[in-house]
């Protein structure tokens, strides 16, 4: 990056909150933390995911969204919700990866859809195929084999609850790989 183009607004966020607005159930911090991947075969195609409050007016505190550009970032498609659960459970902290041949995307996130109390956490994912400028998502699926609790009290100064700030995903031509925090063995968990 010797030079950069003019600033472009890809999406306008409603924001799920930061340290001063612990929006997710359990007092968990949740920044939008967008992630972007570039097509390895077409530099004009970029794909972005982030979490945000529900786009339409709702009480849903956090969903995962996707947008793409086919002109190098000058314009972006309208946001599409990636998680398909119908409830108001939290979905946040997405990661994204693209295959080296540029034909597949993987999006994954923390998800509470399996807990009616909106507390226990799982990791879900959704694969997509890319054909030209068209991205087609498949069905979302559970990745974790067991749910896990929120952990509190790790940072008594700024915020007591963190989850997933540094998660990542990568891909090769046959598989997707994802890291996540998993608290199922923790002794400092709580139920809300």
Give residue spans per PLM region.
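Extracellular, repeat-based ectodomains that mediate carbohydrate processing or recognition
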Residues: 1-192
């Amino acid at each position: 990056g010797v030079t950069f183009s003019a600033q472009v607004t890809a999406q306008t966020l409603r924001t799920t909150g930061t340290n001063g607005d612990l929006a997710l159930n359990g007092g968990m911090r949740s920044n939008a933390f967008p992630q972007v991947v570039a097509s390895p075969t077409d530099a004009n195609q970029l794909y972005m995911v982030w979490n945000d409050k529900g786009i339409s007016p709702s009480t849903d505190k956090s969903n995962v969204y996707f947008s793409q550009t086919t002109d190098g970032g000058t314009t972006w498609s309208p946001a599409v919700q990636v998680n398909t659960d119908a409830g108001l459970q939290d979905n946040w902290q997405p990661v994204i990866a693209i295959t080296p041949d540029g034909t597949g995307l993987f999006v994954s996130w923390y998800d509470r859809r399996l807990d009616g109390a909106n507390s226990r956490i799982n990791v879900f994912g959704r694969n997509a195929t890319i054909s030209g400028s068209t991205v087609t998502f498949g069905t979302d699926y559970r990745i974790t084999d067991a749910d896990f609790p929120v952990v509190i009290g790790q940072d008594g100064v700024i915020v007591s609850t963190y989850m997933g700030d540094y998660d990542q995903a990568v891909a090769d031509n046959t598989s997707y790989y994802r890291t996540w925090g998993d608290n199922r063995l923790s002794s400092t968990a709580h139920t809300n």
